[in-house]
């Protein structure tokens, strides 16, 4: 059913209907109340559900109120009520010992940091109480982890001491005596000979390193992945004795870090 126009009261058909200010209007009836200028949805202004143009839109004016005794009494009463409420709120929060603080991002960050610190301290105290006061069990977790890793890396070193076999060849380069040359009656002093460590020959068993290894003691040798170890002798199931061909160093090496060639 088609509605009636809010101004002329006639039926408004969909082709000329304007729905605005909770009413239905003809396009021609939708005009300013003062100057009768036709309006649309973009330039109208509503006041008390009536359309106005921008020039004739009613402006609100404020009226002055005289300071009569009655108005002064109401003003004083409202001030007293506000003071009473303020004192009530103050008395309620007086015994609580805190003041209301705005929840700013900086305070949230500080609160989060304090929570993390308290959690860390709680876990530290818990670990200390769980480990007990004994020397072995009261050890810090970092020291325990380092000792566990070292004992895992060298399980056989704690059981059997290192013994360098007497049959292991020791390579020494013979030192050449400097020869002095003489020219007539003058004798030229001999130049010093620099002694260099030479890599041993390729005799005996040969192995290839499959991992990098850094020497933990003075009687061990360091090597890299792919290095060749020559003159290898088996000491036990976990350790060998040989010479790194690249560096010429001789000493102990773990058997599970190399493979036979």
From Swiss-Prot:
Nebulin repeats: 61-95, 97-131
LIM zinc-binding domain mapped to chain residues: 5-56
Disordered, as annotated region: 111-186
Location (main, coarse): cytoplasm
A Pfam family assignment: SH3_9
CDD domains referenced in this protein's UniProt entry, alphabetically: LIM_LASP, SH3_Lasp1_C
SUPFAM superfamilies, per database record: Glucocorticoid receptor-like (DNA-binding domain), SH3-domain
First and last residue of the signal peptide: none
Modification(s) after translation: Phosphorylated.
Extent of Low complexity compositional bias: 167-183
Localization per record: Cytoplasm, Cell cortex; Cytoplasm, Cytoskeleton
Positions bearing Phosphothreonine: 68, 104
UniProt entry keywords in alphabetical sequence: Acetylation, Actin-binding, Cytoplasm, Cytoskeleton, Ion transport, LIM domain, Metal-binding, Methylation, Phosphoprotein, Repeat, SH3 domain, Transport, Zinc
Sequence positions bearing N6-succinyllysine: 112
UniProt biased composition (Basic and acidic residues): 121-130
Chain positions with N6-acetyllysine modification: 42
GO cellular component terms, A-Z: cell cortex; cytoskeleton; focal adhesion
Subunit structure: Interacts with F-actin. Interacts with ANKRD54. Interacts with KBTBD10.
Function noted in UniProt: Plays an important role in the regulation of dynamic actin-based, cytoskeletal activities. Agonist-dependent changes in LASP1 phosphorylation may also serve to regulate actin-associated ion transport activities, not only in the parietal cell but also in certain other F-actin-rich secretory epithelial cell types.
Protein known as: LIM and SH3 domain protein 1
